[in-house]
């Protein structure tokens, strides 16, 4: 497994909509394994393919140590391909979020408290999942990436511009 390079804002790829995975191959699964290794390396809770420069509708998630629900031992990591959000709670919950593609930024985001998704798993099998609390938040955050939306898009234009300037400065100091 390889650690993949992270795409950070203001890279334009992060604003593009990802395309569905049409074929499940060993290469697809190897890529998902590489995404997972990369997410762990970055201490992330989730990662979307676009965050490693691939515009495909693939998410990996592992919040095993922070999940409020007791789940089977083999539940995590989650490999979520071509997800669709099929239900959303009306109740919104605001919480602080971070993002691997927005280093050193924390932003308050209001999201539905629970969701239900339909997706393909690691083996291409169709599944449905009801998620609430932190898992629902992480899925929605990563799903936003597939739609070309970042957590800073929930901010006012002024606040978003301030964050983008900070990120540009940070990127220039690293390179």
From Swiss-Prot:
Cofactor(s) listed in the protein's UniProt record: Fe(2+)
EC number: 3.5.1.88
Catalytic activity as recorded in UniProt: N-terminal N-formyl-L-methionyl-[peptide] + H2O = N-terminal L-methionyl-[peptide] + formate
Free-text cofactor note: Binds 1 Fe(2+) ion.
Binding residues for Fe cation: 99, 141, 145
GO biological process, one term: translation
Domain of life per record: Bacteria
Alphabetical list of InterPro entries matching this protein: Peptide_deformylase, Peptide_deformylase_sf
Membrane-spanning parts: none
Gene3D superfamilies in UniProt: Peptide deformylase (3.90.45.10)
Active site: 142
Pfam family, one: Pep_deformylase
GO MF annotation terms: metal ion binding; peptide deformylase activity
SUPFAM superfamilies: Peptide deformylase
Keywords, sorted A to Z: Hydrolase, Iron, Metal-binding, Protein biosynthesis
Signal sequence coordinates: none
NCBIfam families to which the protein is assigned, alphabetical: pept_deformyl (TIGR00079), PRK00150.1-3 (NF001159)
Function description: Removes the formyl group from the N-terminal Met of newly synthesized proteins. Requires at least a dipeptide for an efficient rate of reaction. N-terminal L-methionine is a prerequisite for activity but the enzyme has broad specificity at other positions.
Family in the record: Belongs to the polypeptide deformylase family.
Name this protein carries in UniProt: Peptide deformylase 1
Organism: Rickettsia conorii (strain ATCC VR-613 / Malish 7)
């Amino acid at each position: 497994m390889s650690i993949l390079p992270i795409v950070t804002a203001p890279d334009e790829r992060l604003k593009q909509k990802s395309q569905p995975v049409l074929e499940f191959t060993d290469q697809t699964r190897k890529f998902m394994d590489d995404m997972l290794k990369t997410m762990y390396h970055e201490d992330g809770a989730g990662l979307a393919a676009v965050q490693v420069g691939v515009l495909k509708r693939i998410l990996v998630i592992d919040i095993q140590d922070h999940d409020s629900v007791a789940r089977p031992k083999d539940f995590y990591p989650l490999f979520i391909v071509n997800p669709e959000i099929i239900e959303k709670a009306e109740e919104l919950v605001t919480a602080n979020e971070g993002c691997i593609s927005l280093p050193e930024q924390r932003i308050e985001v209001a999201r539905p408290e629970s969701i239900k998704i339909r997706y393909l798993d690691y083996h291409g099998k169709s599944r449905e999942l009801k998620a609430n609390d932190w898992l629902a938040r992480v899925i929605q955050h990563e799903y936003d990436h597939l739609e070309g939306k970042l957590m800073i898009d929930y901010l006012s234009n002024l606040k978003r511009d301030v964050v983008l300037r900070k990120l540009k400065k940070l990127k220039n100091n690293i390179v």
